């Protein structure tokens, strides 16, 4: 690997350009396809010979993820939030699986691309904003008007609230992107150092221990970032439901 950032480069495998769209196959396309195969395959296996009592290990994992997401939705939004379960479940598995896939040596980290994380974040915010207008109508704009404020302060605070709302997808995207980027760069640097120090016999073992330790740390961060991404999405949904 010539460059530290080479692992984040997007390769073009097949050029497919129509009159209106560019649907060329890139590294991101391939990994998103693998994501679909992995997630669907995991749940196909978990549902194979599924039983109410007992079941296979994959069934237990599927049930644990299901219960985790349901509890998170109820905790943050309440029972009305169950309406969003399919979306939140898909979002959590999407981010988590892509994060974990990026930990495979010599693989590509899709969530280490700001374009991907920002597109995901802005799509979510546009979607829940449209949903907010659908359920509240014009009253949805009350979300930008703080209550119990002096009239002369209102224009400034409304401006701040609007800017805060507009910047939400940016903070959501950059948080995930920056954590994935920094973690993978750190592992890469330690890995290069480990390869160089292998010539010094026992001293060369220490960096590899660090690499393994950081891999486990990154695995935890992969789950944590998926959790935080979904948690913030649920908080935004709760704000729209309650208009605050």
From Swiss-Prot:
Its keywords, alphabetically, are: ATP synthesis, CF(0), Hydrogen ion transport, Ion transport, Membrane, Mitochondrion, Mitochondrion inner membrane, Transmembrane, Transmembrane helix, Transport
Give an example GO molecular function.
Answer: proton transmembrane transporter activity
InterPro entries referenced in this protein's UniProt entry, alphabetically: ATP_synth_F0_asu, ATP_synth_F0_asu_AS, ATP_synth_F0_asu_bact/mt, F0_ATP_A_sf
Q: Locate the transmembrane regions by residue number.
A: 20-40, 81-101, 113-133, 140-160, 176-196, 202-222, 223-243
What membrane topology was assigned to this protein in its record? Multi-pass membrane protein
Does the UniProt entry include the keyword Ion transport? yes
> Which Gene Ontology BP annotations are present?
proton motive force-driven ATP synthesis
Highest taxon of source: Eukaryota
Is Transmembrane helix included in the keywords of this UniProt record? Answer: yes
Query: What subcellular locations does the record give?
Result: Mitochondrion inner membrane
Q: Name one Pfam family in it.
A: ATP-synt_A
GO CC annotation:
mitochondrial inner membrane; proton-transporting ATP synthase complex
Which NCBIfam families does the entry link to? ATP_synt_6_or_A, PRK05815.2-4
Q: What does this protein do?
A: Mitochondrial membrane ATP synthase (F(1)F(0) ATP synthase or Complex V) produces ATP from ADP in the presence of a proton gradient across the membrane which is generated by electron transport complexes of the respiratory chain. F-type ATPases consist of two structural domains, F(1) - containing the extramembraneous catalytic core and F(0) - containing the membrane proton channel, linked together by a central stalk and a peripheral stalk. During catalysis, ATP synthesis in the catalytic domain of F(1) is coupled via a rotary mechanism of the central stalk subunits to proton translocation.
Q: Which family does this protein fall into?
A: Belongs to the ATPase A chain family.
Name of this protein: ATP synthase subunit a
Q: Which organism is it from?
A: Dictyostelium discoideum
Q: Which gene encodes it?
A: atp6
């Amino acid at each position: 690997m010539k460059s530290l950032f080479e692992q984040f480069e997007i390769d073009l495998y097949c050029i497919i350009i129509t009159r209106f769209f560019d649907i060329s196959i890139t590294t991101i396309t391939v990994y998103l396809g693998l994501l679909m195969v992995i997630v669907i395959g995991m749940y196909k296996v978990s549902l194979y010979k599924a039983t109410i009592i007992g079941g296979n290990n994959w069934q237990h994992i599927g049930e644990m993820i299901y219960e985790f997401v349901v509890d998170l939705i109820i905790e943050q939004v309440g029972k009305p939030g169950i309406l969003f379960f399919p979306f939140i479940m898909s979002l959590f598995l999407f981010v988590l699986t892509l994060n974990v896939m990026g930990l495979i040596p010599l693989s590509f980290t899709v969530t280490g691309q700001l374009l991907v994380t920002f597109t995901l974040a802005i799509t979510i915010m546009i979607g829940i904003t449209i949903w907010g207008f659908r359920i509240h109508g014009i009253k949805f704009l009350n979300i930008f008007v703080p209550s119990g404020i002096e009239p002369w302060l209102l224009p400034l605070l409304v401006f701040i609230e609007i800017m805060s709302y507009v910047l939400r997808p940016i903070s959501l995207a950059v948080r995930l992107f920056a954590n994935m980027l920094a973690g993978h760069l750190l592992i890469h640097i330690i890995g290069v150092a480990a390869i160089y120090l292998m010539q010094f016999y026992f001293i060369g073992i220490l960096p590899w221990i660090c690499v393994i330790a950081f891999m486990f740390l990154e695995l935890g961060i992969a789950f944590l970032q998926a959790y935080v991404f979904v948690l913030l999405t649920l908080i935004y949904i709760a704000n729209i439901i309650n208009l605050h």
